[in-house]
A protein has these predicted regions:
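Hydrophobic transmembrane helix segments
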Residues: 14-51
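Short, charged juxtamembrane terminal tails flanking transmembrane helices
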Residues: 1, 115-126
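Hydrophobic alpha-helical transmembrane segments of integral membrane proteins
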Residues: 82-112
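Hydrophobic cores of alpha-helical transmembrane segments in multi-pass inner/ER membrane proteins
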Residues: 11, 55-61, 103-107
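Mid-chain, well-packed structural core segment of small domains
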Residues: 49-90
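Membrane-interfacial loop-to-transmembrane-helix junctions in polytopic alpha-helical membrane proteins
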Residues: 1-4, 40-47, 72, 76, ...
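Transmembrane helix-loop junctions and nearby membrane-interface residues
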Residues: 17-27, 63, 67-70, 92-95, ...
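Interfacial segments of alpha-helical transmembrane regions
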Residues: 1-14, 80
Length: 126
């Protein structure tokens, strides 16, 4: 199997950030022109826009870190799969029409036991 979990997370992060820019472009322009200090707490719309963008950046960092671990051949921790699954399930329950569904494949892949006795990272290095 190819290394794909980190790349998947990076792709989701890029997509998430693109959606943020599409949905909140006007809000970001207003935040920029009015000054960034405290811009994320001016109202609920500004807060949502700020969190949407910041979460995309965090997801990108996580995806890049997972990619680095996959390339090194080190084992990806099962706790990452548990955390991603928890995030996906809670996100889907709170917002069924959302991108949280895209977090399920890597979460489940991280939780799936190796069939040949190798760890997940070695198996994905294929």
């Amino acid at each position: 199997m190819k290394r794909w979990i980190g790349r998947w997370l990076v792709a989701v992060a890029v997509l998430h950030t693109g959606v943020a820019l599409a949905l909140f472009g006007n809000t970001y322009r207003t935040m920029w022109s009015d000054g960034l200090w405290g811009a994320g707490v001016r109202d609920a719309g500004h807060s949502a826009a700020a969190w949407f963008l910041l979460f995309g950046i965090l997801a990108l960092a996580a995806g890049l870190a997972v990619s680095a671990v996959e390339r090194s051949g080190a084992r990806l921790p099962r706790s990452l799969g548990v955390a991603l699954l928890g995030l996906a399930v809670l996100g889907i329950v709170l917002m069924p029409v959302s991108g949280f569904w895209l977090v399920l494949p890597p979460a489940l892949a991280l939780l799936r036991p190796a069939r040949d006795g190798t760890d997940r990272a070695a198996r994905s290095a294929g």
